[in-house]
Amino acid sequence: MNYRGAQNLIKRGDEQGLRTALEGNLSSNTSNHKGWSLLMLAAVEGSVPVGRLLIEKGADLAAMNLKGETALSIATQKGHTAFVELLQEV
């Protein structure tokens, strides 16, 4: 699975589909050409279950996109308090 496929799973909140992809050939640290990681996409959506899964599978919490944003800064900007709390628990 590629970034675009994972992006669609995250937008739909398909935790099981993403789990299957991560158990296959998808890395939890996959990113696009702008540096957007899968965890950042989950932060945009505010999806705590997806975020938790990505963290369990080794997603880099400190990864930055080309604008210098992290999953934490994105979740904070979007007002996704539960997602922010998830990231701060780790």
Named regions from a protein language model:
Residues 3-11, 19:
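Amphipathic alpha-helical repeat scaffolds
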Residues 17, 49-50, 82-83:
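Conserved ankyrin/ankyrin-like repeat signature
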Residues 33-34, 66-67:
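Ankyrin repeat start-site detector
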